């Protein structure tokens, strides 16, 4: 009797995870490493990745930290070259680096708007562009752009963020159409409510947290390991016929039946 197919096995694969010094980036990197991938992990300061590098190495995988400022084109080009040189190839990109400004729309400044759009949308495009240039000659690649549940509807208080994540969803579809002929799939993973540095102030408000739980159909916010299966699937050979899609991992909140405002009560 033959052995079962080792689904979602990333052994021998090299994954680049941007913004991996903390938060969701570490969740994604950890899941990929546990599935066998070696990692290139980025942050604006390489030293910020030191502890996570040690963690990945403790799992028996290799990890290389690379500095990356997604708002700087020269930094993106340099990072892509260093990422490829680290292991000789790039199989997977998890395009995760992002930021948010939490203010009423009437109070958002020009610079704050630009910060969010340049990081979340322009940065996502040019990181994907430069990594795709490394993937195209090999005719293989898995690109996972990290979006948000805000790509399907808006929330008060984070208008630029919603605009940027909606843009990532559409960008994903366009890149999937353009690069599919080169064996590259491009998908968007859109988490719902997960505790991160960006929304810590909300999660520290117990009244708001109970309000949120009541409006998520599964009655709880996301936990780190709730994202593992989704990111590993989209990074693996098993997703070879899935491209241009947005996978919402949100406990059902995007059904629209109940909605939680980002405003504290």
Which sequence ranges carry the predicted segments?
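Conserved glycine-rich cofactor-binding loop
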Residues: 14, 21-22, 45
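Short C-terminal tail/terminal secondary-structure segment
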Residues: 2-7, 153, 232, 243-265
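Active-site loop immediately N-terminal to the catalytic Tyr-X3-Lys motif
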Residues: 106, 153-159, 181-182, 219, ...
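Residue(s) in the substrate-gating loop at a strand-loop-helix junction
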Residues: 148
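Active-site helix of classical SDR
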Residues: 128, 164
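Substrate-binding pocket helix/loop in short-chain dehydrogenase/reductase
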Residues: 104-105, 109-117, 143, 212
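Alpha-helical segment proximal to the catalytic Tyr-Lys
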Residues: 133, 177-181, 240
């Amino acid at each position: 009797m033959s052995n079962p197919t080792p689904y979602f096995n990333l052994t021998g694969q090299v994954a680049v995870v941007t913004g991996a010094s903390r938060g969701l980036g570490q969740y994604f990197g950890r899941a990929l490493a546990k599935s066998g991938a070696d990692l290139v992990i980025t942050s604006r300061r390489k030293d910020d990745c030191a502890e996570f590098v040690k963690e990945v190495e403790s799992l028996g995988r290799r990890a290389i930290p690379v500095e990356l400022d997604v708002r700087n084109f020269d930094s993106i080009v340099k990072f892509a070259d260093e990422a490829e040189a680290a292991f000789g190839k790039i199989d997977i990109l998890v395009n995760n680096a992002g930021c948010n400004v939490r203010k009423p729309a009437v109070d958002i400044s020009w610079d704050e708007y630009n910060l969010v759009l340049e990081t979340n949308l322009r940065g996502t495009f040019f990181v994907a562009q430069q990594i795709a240039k490394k993937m195209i000659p090999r005719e293989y690649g898995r690109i996972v752009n990290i979006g948000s549940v805000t790509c399907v509807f808006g929330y008060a208080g984070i208008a630029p963020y919603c605009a940027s994540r909606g843009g990532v969803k559409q960008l994903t579809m366009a890149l999937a159409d353009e690069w599919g002929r080169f064996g590259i799939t491009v998908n968007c993973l859109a988490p719902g409510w997960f505790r991160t540095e960006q929304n810590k102030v909300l999660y520290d408000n117990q009244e708001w947290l109970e309000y949120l739980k009541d409006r998520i159909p599964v009655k709880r916010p996301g936990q780190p390991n709730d994202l593992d299966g989704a990111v590993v699937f989209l990074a693996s050979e098993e997703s070879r016929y899935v491209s241009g899609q947005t996978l919402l991992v949100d406990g059902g909140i995007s059904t629209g039946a109940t909605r939680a405002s980002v405003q504290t009560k």
